[in-house]
């Protein structure tokens, strides 16, 4: 009764007002799964390809070709297949595409179908998505990385790092973690306003004030944590997303906002120093995606005490992750479903990380929708951490609200990851 009888792809708009792909999958028993595909602003060179139309329509960002692939070739290939066989369905679509990066049909087309198939099958099974994907062991609520201050590609200010995040590691429950984050977010807003800074929010709901450098941003966050009544480090830690590929030029890290240029060793030492001066427990993309020597230097220097997350470095790709593990670089992978383009490959990346004692952080993209699938996947994989934006914008809050519901559903079985995510 789980045979796929219909697939409907459509073009909808994401949180930035750009087109994206949404897919409905209908099963023989009438069960329906719907998934919408996110889109990134700072994308790694090794990501699966998001198919865009080009031309004047939507200023070149239309996804009509990807939708056509969903309604045409993909439906013809997997229509009639049993939706329970997720691996076979995903492999069929990957083989149909026939390219190493899903550039013919589009990762946005393949992923939309892949996630919708899983959601339809969960509905047919009478199970929530996290339970269907993760089985009986899915019970860990992730620590949120809450993006409250922005720079880099996410802002028009002098700060070169892309994201400054808070992690409520000392909260007793996910619901409390969300409350703590909200209280700090609003305290920060008041502090910025009092200091004469702009408090408009960016793509991911964080503030983008005109601060001079990373230290100024970190000092504002520390003050806000304390003023909200929490202890920096013990109760609320800090995480960074440097997005270093964005300012890596000719083998150097060029901090245009600060007027500084650092080589790989100096970059590693700078980040390690910051982690010593502030309660920073996680640094994402501290080095450029192909600066393997820099990554090794950073890992040797800070890897025992700080979570070093590879985003552009690994692009949710199990093969690239295995290479990194063999090189001894980083100790964590950021998991973005649209970087790799199918549920099966996403789960493979998480499994590869966990087998090597690397952590995994489930993540949104800067262009999001009301789809809350990644909240379920964070619990399904027991990865213990989720990165899904600030405490503003409904496209971000949809994920937090879904996690609150999941914690409620799990009842006494629910466990908030808390301080288990802290290294050292």
UniProtKB/Swiss-Prot annotation:
GO terms for molecular function: magnesium ion binding; phosphopyruvate hydratase activity. SMART domains: Enolase_C, Enolase_N. Mg(2+) binds at residues 241, 284, 311. The active site is at residues 204, 336. Pfam families: Enolase_C, Enolase_N. (2R)-2-phosphoglycerate binds at residues 162, 336, 365-366, 387. GO terms for biological process: glycolytic process. Its main location: cytoplasm. PROSITE patterns: ENOLASE. Binds a second Mg(2+) ion via substrate during catalysis. Keywords: Cytoplasm, Glycolysis, Lyase, Magnesium, Metal-binding, Secreted. Belongs to the enolase family. NCBIfam families: eno. This is Enolase. It comes from Chelativorans sp. (strain BNC1). The lineage of its organism: Bacteria, Pseudomonadati, Pseudomonadota, Alphaproteobacteria, Hyphomicrobiales.
């Amino acid at each position: 009764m789980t045979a796929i009888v219909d697939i409907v792809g459509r073009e909808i708009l994401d949180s930035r007002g750009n087109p994206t792909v949404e897919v409905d999958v209908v099963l023989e028993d009438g069960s329906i799964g719907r998934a919408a595909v996110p889109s990134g602003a700072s994308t790694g060179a090794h990501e699966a390809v998001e198919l865009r139309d080009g031309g004047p329509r939507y200023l070149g960002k239309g996804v009509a070709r990807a939708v056509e692939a969903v309604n045409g070739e993909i439906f013809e290939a997997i229509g009639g297949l049993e939706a329970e066989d997720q691996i076979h369905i995903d492999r069929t679509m990957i083989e149909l595409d026939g390219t190493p990066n899903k550039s013919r049909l589009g990762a946005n087309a393949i992923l939309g179908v892949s996630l919708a198939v899983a959601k339809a099958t969960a509905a047919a099974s009478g199970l929530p998505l996290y339970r269907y994907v993760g089985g009986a062991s899915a019970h860990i609520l992730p620590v949120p990385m809450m993006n409250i201050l922005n720079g880099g590609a996410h802002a028009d200010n002098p700060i070169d790092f892309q994201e400054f995040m808070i992690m409520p590691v000392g909260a007793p429950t996910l619901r409390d973690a969300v409350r703590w984050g909200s209280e700090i977010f609003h305290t920060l807003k008041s502090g910025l306003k009092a200091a004469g800074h702009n408090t408009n929010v960016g793509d991911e709901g964080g503030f983008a004030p005109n601060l001079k450098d990373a230290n100024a941003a970190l000092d504002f966050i520390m003050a806000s944590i304390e003023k909200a009544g929490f202890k920096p480090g013990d109760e609320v830690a800090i995480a960074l997303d440097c997005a270093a590929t964005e300012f890596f030029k000719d083998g150097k890290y060029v901090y245009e906002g600060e007027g500084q240029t650092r080589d790989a060793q100096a970059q590693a030492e700078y980040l390690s120093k910051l982690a010593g001066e502030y309660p920073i427990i996680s640094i994402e993309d501290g080095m450029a995606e192909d600066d393997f020597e820099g990554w090794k230097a950073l890992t040797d220097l800070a890897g025992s005490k700080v979570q070093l997350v590879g985003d552009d470095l690994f692009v949710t790709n199990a093969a690239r992750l295995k290479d990194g593990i063999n090189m001894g670089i980083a100790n964590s992978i950021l998991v973005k479903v649209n970087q790799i383009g199918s549920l099966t490959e996403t789960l493979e990346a998480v499994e590869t990380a966990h087998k090597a004692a690397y952590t995994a952080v489930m993540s949104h993209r800067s262009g999001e929708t009301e789809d809350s699938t990644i909240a379920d996947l964070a619990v399904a994989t027991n990865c213990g951490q989720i990165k899904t934006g600030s405490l503003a914008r409904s496209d971000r809050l949809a994920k937090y609200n879904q996690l609150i519901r999941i914690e409620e559903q799990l009842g006494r079985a629910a466990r908030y990851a808390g301080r288990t995510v802290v290294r050292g």
